[in-house]
């Protein structure tokens, strides 16, 4: 996701760039002057970001921000999953018929090795792995934007 949105006039000339953090919970800004139309024109021609597990700083530090601080979308999603008792990634992997996990190496067929290594430092064992974290780290299947477990779940 891009960290900013271009606003374009009727000639498709960029007249402003709006940081994503300035648009959270401020729908009234779209009603001022010609902003809504400018935003739509900008979005229709702004390049789409590749689907990956990298988040813009606007989403990891400034989500729903005031002038001093904001929230982190990744932390918020992990906590939401825990609050709703979403099972861990390895449970869903097993439910999809992809085997069970007892060691970190069992994940390397679905998640790139470097990311598995990083996960092994953040989590005590594979059974603790949050579904949200693992699903955004899964290797994307050809022709899709999803990994194996989330696509089979």
Describe the residue ranges of each PLM region.
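Polyanionic, low-complexity segments and short acidic motifs
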Residues: 1-153
């Amino acid at each position: 996701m891009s960290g900013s949105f271009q606003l374009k006039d009727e000639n498709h000339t960029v007249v402003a760039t709006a940081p994503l953090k300035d648009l959270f919970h401020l729908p009234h800004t779209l009603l001022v002057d010609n902003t809504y139309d400018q935003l739509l024109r900008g979005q229709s021609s702004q390049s789409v970001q590749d689907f990956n597990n990298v988040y813009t700083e606007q989403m990891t530090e400034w989500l729903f921000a005031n002038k001093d601080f904001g929230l982190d979308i990744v932390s918020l999603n992990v906590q939401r999953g825990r609050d709703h008792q979403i099972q861990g990634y390895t449970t869903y992997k097993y439910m999809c018929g992809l085997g069970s996990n007892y060691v970190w190496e069992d994940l390397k067929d679905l998640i790139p090795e470097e990311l598995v290594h990083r996960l092994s430092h953040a989590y005590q064992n594979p059974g603790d792995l949050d579904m949200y974290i693992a699903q955004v780290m899964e290797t994307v299947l050809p022709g899709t934007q999803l990994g194996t477990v989330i696509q089979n779940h």
